[in-house]
A protein has these predicted regions:
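Non-catalytic cap/lid and distal C-terminal segments of serine-dependent acyl enzymes
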Residues: 1-285
Length: 285
């Protein structure tokens, strides 16, 4: 548990699911008159400590904001249970037919199922944010959403469909591949809003350099061919680079996009680098 962290457990009235918030409030500086900037971090059970330590270290520089960090997670100390619980919250609906094809057919079925992302956004807006704002003064013009993998996918969905809920978005190794890249169905409408000057936001999309490099790991319940198929289907690096290039081409003065490939990192190694870069991107002034 990170220093100065508070824990808030609640059961959602939106979807009747149990959540745990990990909240770290900065203490080294006076509270800004407008309230604190805040980072809402998906998968709080997994990455909260990294995010807090990174934010506090970077805030040693006077030109870096020291934010409140909120990890959104589940009331469990088990990594496996947290990974299972996240599957419904961080995915959109997917057909049973599609679940029988490709990489996802080789994955263990979560006990929660899939397809609860829309309700998850409501949980954040209607239940997470009010609890945090009751605890500490928040600057509603300095809200960041950050997530890795399916959390990165969720962050992209928020960028495209819930843009006004946050001002900055950090998608680390987003699972764009999910459900035949269904998230990209919302890209065209978002791009039109950007061109029309209706979007004011900043976004960082990053990925590990090795995520599209085939690597077989013996000892896991997957064959060498399974790993090869997964690498080819997921297209982690090309998906991020192609999306980043398209968004950068929009060239709007109110929308800033940065794409980063983290050298030497694979999917499970990239969160520390992605979070560190995300804190710098969103908090440096």
């Amino acid at each position: 548990m990170a220093l100065n962290a508070r824990v808030i457990d609640f059961t959602s009235k939106v979807n009747d699911r149990a959540y745990r918030l990990f909240v770290s409030i900065p203490t080294r500086r006076p509270v800004p008159p407008e309230g604190h900037a805040v980072v809402y971090l998906i998968d709080g059970n997994l990455h909260f400590g990294i995010a807090v330590d990174t934010a506090r270290i970077q805030a040693c520089w006077p030109d870096v904001i020291d934010p409140v960090v909120v990890g959104i997670g589940y009331p469990t100390d088990s990594v496996n249970q947290a990974l299972d619980q996240r599957m419904i919250d961080l995915t959109t609906p997917i057909s049973e037919e599609r679940l029988k094809k490709g990489f996802i057919a080789k994955m263990p079925r979560p006990t929660t199922g899939y397809g609860g992302m829309d309700e998850y956004f409501r949980v954040i807006e209607e239940e997470v944010k009010p609890r945090v704002e009751a605890l500490v003064a928040i600057n509603k013009l300095e809200q960041v959403l950050m997530g890795h993998s399916l959390g990165g996918l969720t962050t992209l969905h928020a960028l495209f469909r819930h843009t006004a809920s946050f001002q900055q978005f950090v998608a680390i190794a987003p699972s764009i591949w999910y459900n035949d890249r269904a998230v990209l169905a919302h890209e065209a409408a978002f791009s039109e809003r950007v061109r029309a000057g209706q979007v004011k936001a900043r976004a960082l999309i990053s990925v590990g350099e090795l995520e599209s490099t085939f690597r077989f790991v013996p000892g896991l319940p997957a064959s060498e061919q399974d790993f090869r198929d997964m690498t080819e289907e997921c297209r982690m690096v090309p998906n991020v680079q192609e999306l980043g290039a398209r968004l950068a081409a929009l060239a709007s003065p109110q929308f800033e996009i940065e794409t980063v490939v983290h050298a030497g990192d694979d999917h499970n190694m990239v969160p520390p680098a992605g979070i560190a870069r995300g804190i710098r991107f969103t908090m440096r002034r």
